[in-house]
């Protein structure tokens, strides 16, 4: 005798469904034509439901009631004489309530074949548009399309506020060929919390955050959040058009590196972060007033541990909750652009943390990482390394880079820890790593990924800047990919940074023995397109602030720091300075507290801040300081061998017709009168800038603004002049005829 169950569920499908072992649920639940083609059958699984009716969406009429097949919550029934599928609601009677929902199992697959191909191939640039949680309109019905990559999972369900976190309620459709799971859910609200519930190959169940979530809960919670439907209306067309035609390797770039959580805080005890509106009102005017060209944001992808500063993100697509939502971040970038300020984002693609709700063994297998810890584990940070050879992982990362550039209008990415990506033996002892196919230590898969990434991003987003934090001598980081380079636009000059800060920390009396630490960088300055960076890494972990590194009394510390900045701004290469360094913060950076803005009540700190502002204005006003940054013709030593006096003199050149600039840097407290220097052209010169001016807190020694040229050749120049070189100072001299281009000091 046929029972209620086997009248609608064949071959034990009902038992398999109840036990969570029926993975092809879309072939069973929802609306289907009967085997004889003469009727429609609707099946559903609704725990605790008492009664279920099928309602036509078109006319709102009740079509049929479903039979309760068993007490577990299986319902099924035929649709009378109807044989043509139609859109319907389920009217569900519970013990204490009645609700109506659109049955998600009546919808077919929504994934596009081209998207699936590109995702698997490793070249998808918009995977976030079909993976994760995306608002869709299907046959006039609005809802959220959930999709996740989990090829080895036995079952995947989406659970959340909308289904009481019931893993049996919304089991997803499996695409066997590519490992994707999807479901379209109407009746989901903006801001709903959700996760993916996965049954691993060994039968264990684990709830995971959505790898493509665009919003997440704050720690210690870790649910993903359905995004808002509202979109930001961009007003930065002028900037975007200008950016697209700007050759940044020839343009001034003075980048202000910012940790949004500690630049400034609010609250009675500084316990609250500034939100994006606060940052629009405070950070942007400050950066503009200081004449920086760009802001670089330390990572803002969602991260659970404050002490990671964002460098161990779990939600790579989700702007952190700390400062506001995605629209708030877009408004901040938009406001920066309207103020003519570019915004670069720190991007972490070298590794990811082991937080159990994250990517680690996502479907019960090493999906994003390598199985072998000799390739998959980062020894320094106890994190996991992406499997750059897997197409889907490449698409995940490529799409994420595109996501920040396309959806948030960021002007470039600074890729963190590139060195750890390039070498298989990075921070490993012999026997702790596996060689590549040719027996070498280069990570060929990571190299290929970086080349592909840079090539595609520069092609898709004209005028962006791709910046590498790379600390080794790996050749060709900024060479084009068609010349076998990695294709970055710029590379941090870690050698210059280490040498110059080492020099800075020495007593002036001993600097003569370390003169090469400031001159050696010019031996390799044109091998890459370098960026001179003094970043957050140099003012933490007991290293002290820049001011703290310098020996001597306060006057010497401040004077030396001003001279150092002058040398940095005169040296070929773009500039990056971490927040707080521009006003000589005394204590090393603490991410838990605001910068010490109260120091600006004191003249020495005001002087350094004013000096940086004037350096930036000179930098932007004089093309000789940027247009030939990466060509030897843009720089010439006048004297690089005066170690006994610790004085450095050089010329910066621009294109034909551009005024040259002479830099004189004295790194001892000695004053030099009647000091002869060569001049790059005939005619008198003036002091464009003098770091020893009283305006900056100096002793106000110098040349009264004017340097009189003499027809005496010197240092390979036809003209020369006798000047006064102030103590611990930087002088910037330029032709009198061009002094209107710069602020005269």
UniProtKB/Swiss-Prot annotation:
The active site is at 416 (nucleophile), 469 (proton donor). One of its GO terms (cellular component) is cytosol. Pathway: Glycan biosynthesis; glycogen biosynthesis. GO terms for biological process: glycogen biosynthetic process. It catalyses: Transfers a segment of a (1->4)-alpha-D-glucan chain to a primary hydroxy group in a similar glucan chain. SMART domains: Aamy. Its EC number is 2.4.1.18. HAMAP family: GlgB. Catalyzes the formation of the alpha-1,6-glucosidic linkages in glycogen by scission of a 1,4-alpha-linked oligosaccharide from growing alpha-1,4-glucan chains and the subsequent attachment of the oligosaccharide to the alpha-1,6 position. Belongs to the glycosyl hydrolase 13 family. GlgB subfamily. Monomer. This is 1,4-alpha-glucan branching enzyme GlgB.
């Amino acid at each position: 005798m046929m029972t209620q169950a086997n009248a609608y569920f064949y071959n034990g499908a009902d038992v398999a469904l109840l036990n969570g072992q029926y993975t092809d649920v879309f072939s069973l639940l929802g609306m289907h034509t009967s085997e004889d083609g003469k009727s429609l059958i609707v099946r559903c699984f609704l725990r605790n439901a008492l009664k279920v009716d099928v309602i036509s969406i078109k006319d709102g009429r009740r079509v049929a009631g479903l039979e309760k097949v068993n007490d577990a919550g299986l319902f099924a029934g035929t649709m009378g004489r109807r044989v043509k599928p139609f859109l319907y609601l389920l009217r569900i009677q519970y013990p204490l309530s009645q609700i109506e929902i659109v049955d998600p199992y009546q919808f077919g697959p929504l994934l596009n074949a081209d998207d699936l191909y590109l995702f698997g191939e490793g070249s998808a640039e918009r995977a976030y548009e079909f993976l994760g949680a995306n608002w869709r309109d299907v046959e006039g019905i609005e809802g959220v399309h959930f999709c996740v990559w989990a090829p080895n999972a036995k079952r995947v369900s989406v659970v959340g506020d909308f289904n009481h976190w019931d893993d049996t309620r919304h089991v997803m459709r499996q695409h066997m060929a590519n490992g994707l799971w999807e479901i379209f859910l109407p009746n989901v609200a903006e801001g709903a919390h959700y996760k993916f519930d996965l049954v691993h190959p060994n039968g264990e169940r684990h709830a995971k955050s959505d790898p493509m979530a665009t919003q997440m809960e704050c720690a210690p919670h870790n649910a993903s959040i359905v995004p808002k439907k509202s979109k930001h209306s961009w007003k930065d067309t002028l900037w975007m058009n200008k950016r697209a035609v700007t050759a940044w390797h020839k343009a001034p770039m003075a980048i202000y590196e910012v940790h949004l959580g500690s630049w400034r805080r609010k609250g009675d005890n500084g316990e609250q972060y500034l939100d994006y509106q606060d940052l629009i009102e405070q950070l942007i005017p400050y950066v503009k007033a200081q004449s920086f060209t760009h802001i670089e944001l330390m990572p803002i992808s969602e991260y659970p541990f404050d002490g990671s500063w964002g460098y161990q993100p779990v939600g790579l697509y989700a702007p952190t909750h700390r400062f506001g939502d995605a629209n708030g971040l877009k408004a901040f970038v938009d406001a920066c652009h309207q103020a003519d300020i570019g915004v670069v984002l720190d991007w972490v693609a070298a590794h990811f943390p082991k937080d159990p709700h994250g990517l680690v063994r996502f479907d019960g297998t090493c999906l994003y990482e390598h199985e072998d810890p000799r390739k998959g584990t980062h020894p320094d940070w106890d994190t996991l390394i992406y499997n750059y050879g897997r197409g889907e992982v490449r698409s995940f990362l490529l799409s994420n880079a595109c996501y920040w550039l396309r959806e948030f209008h960021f002007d470039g990415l600074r890729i963190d820890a590139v060195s750890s990506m390039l070498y298989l033996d990075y921070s490993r002892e012999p026997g702790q790593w596996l060689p590549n196919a040719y027996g070498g230590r280069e990570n060929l898969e990571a190299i290929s990924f970086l080349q592909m990434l840079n090539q595609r991003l520069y092609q898709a987003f004209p005028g962006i800047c791709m910046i590498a934090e790379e600390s080794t001598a790996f050749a060709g980081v900024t060479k084009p990919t068609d010349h076998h380079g990695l294709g970055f636009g710029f590379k941090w000059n870690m050698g210059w940074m280490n040498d110059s800060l080492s020099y800075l920390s020495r007593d002036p009396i001993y600097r003569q023995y370390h003169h090469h630490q400031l001159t050696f960088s010019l031996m390799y300055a044109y091998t890459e397109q370098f960026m001179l960076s003094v970043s957050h890494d140099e003012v933490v972990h007991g290293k002290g602030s820049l001011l703290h590194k310098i020996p001597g009394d306060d006057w010497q510390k401040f004077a030396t720091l001003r001279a150092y900045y002058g040398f940095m701004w005169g040296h070929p290469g773009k500039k990056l300075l971490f927040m707080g360094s521009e006003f000589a913060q005394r204590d090393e950076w603490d991410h838990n507290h605001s910068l010490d803005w109260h120091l600006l009540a004191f003249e020495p700190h005001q002087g350094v801040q004013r000096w940086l502002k004037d350096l930036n204005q000179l930098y932007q006003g004089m093309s000789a300081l940027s247009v030939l940054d990466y060509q030897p013709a843009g720089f010439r030593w006048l004297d690089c061998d005066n170690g006994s006096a610790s004085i450095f003199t050089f010329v910066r050149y621009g294109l034909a017709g551009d005024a040259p600039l002479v830099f004189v840097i004295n790194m001892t407290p000695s004053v030099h009168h009647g000091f002869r220097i060569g001049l790059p052209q005939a005619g008198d010169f003036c002091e464009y800038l003098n770091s020893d001016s009283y305006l900056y807190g100096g002793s106000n020694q110098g040349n009264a603004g004017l340097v009189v040229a003499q027809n005496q050749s010197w240092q390979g120049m036809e003209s020369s002049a006798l000047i006064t070189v102030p103590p611990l100072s930087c002088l910037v001299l330029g032709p009198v005829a061009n002094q209107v281009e710069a602020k005269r000091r």
